[in-house]
Design a protein with these regions (language model features):
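PLD/PLD-like phosphodiesterase catalytic module centered on the HKD motif
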Residues: 1-68, 73-198
Length: 198
């Protein structure tokens, strides 16, 4: 009985966070897909920095050719942890066509305070590229990381840790991948990164 109550509470929490994190259109899609038995991947909610750190590792581990990251300040401790950087480095060195693209809404903090991801990008600039989100597109308050248009971790508010992670949800990953591509094409290589040789 207690387990049933816990399962119900967990499912309700997932649905509520999904609605909050992904918005009503994508949340409706998730509601339908939650009713079906999953054959691939897993989905869970996060609410702490530590859970976000692990989620980033889990999602990027799913990538074999492309990682797209939309962040406000490179989130110190998340995208510059030794474990995360090792996964990225292993991926780009084993796949000549691998590509890591990072959109940063406010890169000043990352450049000013130093960031190991930026340093790695300097060394592997054939594979890793940073761009500064164009000023009129900085209204996007979310943060997300997409692997191969298949897996993603998504937070509606970049300054909060609540979000949802899915290691196999191509339709939703492609939806946010398309938004990422549009912002990417409209943005430019950040001058401060260019001065660093990135």
């Amino acid at each position: 009985m207690m387990r049933d109550a816990n399962d119900f509470h967990r499912q309700t929490l997932v649905q509520n966070v999904t609605q909050l994190a992904l918005g009503p259109i994508v949340a409706r899609y998730y509601d339908r897909s939650m009713e079906q038995a999953r054959e691939k991947g897993k989905r869970w909610v996060i609410s702490t920095r530590e859970e976000m750190q692990q989620a980033a590792l889990d999602v990027v581990s799913e990538a074999s050719r492309k990682v797209s990251i939309f962040t406000h300040d490179l989130e110190p401790g998340i995208y510059d942890s030794p474990e995360f950087l090792e996964i990225i480095k292993r991926m780009v060195l084993s796949q000549t066509y691998a590509r890591i693209r990072v959109l940063i809404a406010n890169p000043t903090r990352a450049v000013k305070n130093g960031n190991n991801f930026v340093s790695l990008g300097r060394r592997l600039n054939t594979y890793i590229e940073f761009r500064h989100v164009r000023e009129d597109l900085r209204t996007h308050g979310e943060a997300f990381c997409i692997a191969d248009e298949t897996a993603l971790v998504y937070r509606l508010q970049a300054d909060r840790w609540e979000g949802i992670v899915d290691t196999y949800e191509p339709a939703v990953a492609k939806l946010y991948g398309k938004m990422f591509d549009e912002i990417w094409l409209a943005s430019e290589v950040e001058m401060e990164f260019r001065q660093l040789g990135i």
